[in-house]
Swiss-Prot record:
Cofactor descriptive note: Binds 2 manganese ions per subunit.
Keyword Metal-binding carried by entry: yes
Compartments, record wording: Cytoplasm
Main location: cytoplasm
Cellular component per GO, a single term: cytoplasm
Domain of life: Bacteria
Protein known as: Probable cytosol aminopeptidase
EC number(s) given by UniProt: 3.4.11.1, 3.4.11.10
Active site feature: 286, 360
Binding-site residues, Mn(2+) 1: 279, 356, 358
Length: 503
């Protein structure tokens, strides 16, 4: 799909090219107050009051998400006009904008339009410029057009015909909007990779498959990939990671992916992604109902790989290292048992009270490994706890950090990227719940504050660098009729790196 940018100040009579240019449809926003302004006012004038008459007749009330097509409109070059309800003008915020653009894309994709002129990006949204609106609109469109068909014997072809979108933006935002197009396409491509990896079944997306995916990203985008096997992991003394992997016939992999966009001496940001490609719970076996969704337990790894692809496509001037410990968590005669004690790469001993709290066991060794890069910051991403889903639901990812400045950067990025996160507590008092009579610490801290104690466990392995943890158990995938991976938190991570790179 092709996206282009055209500057236009509708209030200054600069709309002639839009009014006369050939297009299958021009998209206009209407507030509930039904007062026309900007593009809608110019189009109304050019069509001799058609939009005003439609509103007066009651066919478009401006309620959020409502759409109405006007066909064979005279006075303009577009063969159709799509009116999109924006809701109340004084309540028009990021969510209202996203609702409006999503409604517009759904309406357009149900038709046979090929080329569209899109004016909604110029709407005032929380004092954001139109380049932000362009990026959000492209991501919304790519979200609507994403389909996972790789495992179908006869994949259905795309039903829409849309091929080209021309965005009208404020002239002062034209240059930034062109950058936004590039970033949005790269982000969408990274999110699609993340979704594809999550949606693949566990018998396809194995640890070896993730390792090969990292190698392909490296080959396609000029990165450096290292994929360590069992013997190399053993040599590193990653006893905690290996305690999870030991009962599976699938060999574990430890993936390290390097992107160098800045000077070699510049400290990298390290992203660590949990890569449990299927989680049965091990000896602490999960209930059978819904266990199929445990193929999504590698979505932390998928989001890190998707972010690396997006960063490479954007060409960010920053150094980034991705680390992915990946294995299956299976029961078996040689599986780790509740009560077993294992030794981490750091040397700390861990009493494994529950083998279904395995994500932290593979992440802790990866976080120790990250020290060798002398990182500027480390962010781990994991579908870590059901407790985080109970606390935050499916809207916000849980953010934990021992560094207030880093947490602030991530929260700012989450708002800019429309990929919400909520900071959770990480007080020292919670550490007491991880005490063990027999080892340095236990891998669980009981039912109270389960998401917090999981993050507290990880914090024991992050004392030498600024660190944050994103628990995406509630946001990485959806269940029900819309079942599938979401691609989150690729937008948040990518925006954080864009901000760090100053781009």
């Amino acid at each position: 799909m092709d996206f282009s940018i055209k500057g236009c100040d509708w209030s200054k009579g600069e709309a002639k090219g839009f009014l006369t240019g050939k297009s299958d449809c021009i998209v206009l926003g209407i507030f509930e107050a039904q007062t026309l302004s900007g593009a809608a006012l110019d189009i109304d004038t050019a069509t001799k009051g058609l939009i005003s008459r439609v509103i007066k007749a009651g066919d478009m009330d401006g309620k959020r998400g409502k759409t109405l097509f006007l066909h064979e409109v005279s006075g303009i070059g577009a063969s159709r006009v799509l009116l999109v309800g924006l809701g109340k003008q004084d309540a028009f915020n990021q969510k209202a904008y996203n609702d409006a653009v999503t409604a517009a894309w759904r309406a357009l994709l149900a038709t046979k339009v090929v080329q569209v002129t899109f004016t909604l990006a110029q709407l005032p949204v929380d004092e954001r410029s139109s380049d932000w609106g362009v990026r959000a609109a492209i991501l919304a469109l790519r979200n609507e057009t994403y389909r996972f068909t790789q495992m179908k014997s006869k994949p259905e072809p795309a039903s829409h015909t849309l091929k080209r979108v021309v965005f009208s933006v404020d002239p002062s935002d034209e240059k930034a909007a062109k950058v936004a197009v590039k970033q949005a396409v790269a982000l969408a491509n990274g999110m699609d990779l993340t979704r594809d990896l999550g949606n693949l079944p566990g018998n396809v997306c194995t640890p070896t498959y993730l390792g090969n995916t990292a190698k392909k990203i490296a080959k396609d985008w000029g990165l450096k990939a290292e994929v360590l096997g069992l013997k190399q992991i053993q040599a590193l003394k990653m006893g905690s990671f290996l305690s999870v992997a030991r009962a599976s016939v699938e060999p574990p992999q430890f993936i390290v992916l390097h992107y160098q966009g800045a000077a070699a001496k510049a400290a990298p940001v390290v992203l660590v992604g949990k890569g449990i490609t299927f989680d049965t719970g091990g000896i602490s076996l999960k209930p059978g109902e819904g266990m199929d969704e445990m193929k999504y337990d590698m979505c932390g790894a998928g989001s890190v790989l998707g972010t690396m692809r997006a960063v490479a496509e954007m060409g960010l001037k920053i150094n980034v290292v991705a680390i992915v410990p990946t294995c299956e968590n299976m029961p078996g005669g040689n599986a780790t048992k509740p009560g077993d004690i294992v030794t981490s790469m750091k040397g700390l001993t861990i009493e494994v009270l529950n083998t279904d709290a395995e994500g932290r066991l593979i992440l802790c060794d990866a976080l120790t490994y990250a020290e060798r890069f002398k990182p500027a910051a480390v962010i781990d991403v994991a579908t870590l706890t059901g407790a985080c889903v109970i606390a935050l639901g499916g809207h916000n990812s849980g953010l934990f950090s021992t560094d207030d400045a880093l947490a602030g950067e991530l929260l700012d990025a989450s708002r800019e990227a429309n990929d919400p996160a909520w900071r959770m507590p990480l007080d020292d008092e919670y550490q007491d719940q991880l005490k063990s009579n027999f080892a340095d610490l236990a891998n669980i801290g009981g039912r109270p504050a389960g998401a917090v104690t999981a993050a507290c466990f990880l914090s024991r392995f992050t004392e030498s660098y600024p660190w944050a943890h994103l628990d995406i158990a509630g946001t990485a995938w959806k269940g029900g009729a819309a079942k599938g991976a979401t691609g989150r938190p690729v937008p948040l991570l990518a925006q954080f790196l864009i901000d760090r790179a100053g781009q």
